[in-house]
Amino acid sequence: EFLGLFHCGKERRNSVRQNDLYEQKRRWQRIFLFFFLLFLTGVLIPGGCASEGKKSQSGKKGDPRDPSAQVLQTEASGEVTYGNDLVVLDASHTADGYVMICYNGSNEKVKLQVTSPDGTEYTYPVTVVGDYAVYPLPGGNGSYKVTLLESVSVEDNLYAVSFTQDLDVQITDEFAPFLHPNYYVNFTADSKCVKKGESLAGKDCYSDLDVVTQIYNFVIKNISYDKKKAENVPYGYTPNPDETLDTGKGICFDYAALMSAMLRSQRIPTKLEVGYSGDVYHAWISCYVDPGGTPPDTTARPDRTGPGTPT
């Protein structure tokens, strides 16, 4: 059971430069996917992608969009590393909008805190031991602080700093953090979700907005809400988009991760965020699409979303 909400609107940027990009390069459109437990409601986009002889959601007719998937690679290349006995931070590819963390400790509850240039703190669980995991740098260019926190009291939710490192980050492409796979949006070129996204994008889609529409409609029509799973989500839960696709069910986090993986592999920058709407914990996504189109006709709902952790 779930309540699905699709809402498009303009996202404010933090700098004059980004506002210029917003006006000149792309339109920032937000897609909120809220999934609650009380009602079964699907707010669908009428019409899906453009069919033969019809205009696309962008209102333009031309050559179909290339549906070929593109999966950007992440790598701990070892060119720039920091760390101690517990952790290795590979910062070789900060220009691509990510760092990689290899935790080698035994603490049962570990977190990674990424402080962006504007002081916003983004906190992610660390559950991979003995291997690298990818974490995004979502705050643009500037000075970041990466901090590893280990639990000292699970009952009291207390943590101690085990490692911290300052990084000067200059991201080559501002959209890069939202195109690469990472800890929460985990996929490869061989993932089933990537193949499915490619198939959906090949169904008479003429624009990025058509692809968003097609994938969104597929997800809300074919994935059902797993109430039992929602009641027993463990600490550090990581969505598996292929598993969600195979089982046809999941929680809001699964919906958002599946759609994010499909869209990123279609070269559409997509940000997954987790946070609270009132007392309800949920996940939603935002994506960048090319300008010139008209957002799908959807039922408008108030934006009650508070700050979230993007990935």
What annotation goes with each model-predicted range?
Residues G4, C8-R13, R17-L209, P295-P302:
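N-terminal accessory/pre-domain segments preceding catalytic cores
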Residues K60-P64, Q73, E231-V233, E243-G250:
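A broad, low-specificity signal for short, low-complexity segments enriched in glycine/proline
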Residues T123, T247-G250, E273-Y276:
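Alpha-helix capping and helix-loop boundary segments enriched in small/acidic/polar residues
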Residues Y144, Y159, F178, Y216-F218, ...:
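Aromatic side chains
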Residues L179-T247, P295, P307:
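Secondary-structure boundary elements
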Residues V211-I215, T247-L263:
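Active-site nucleophilic cysteine motif
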Residues D254-T311:
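Hydrophobic/aromatic-rich core segments of domains that either
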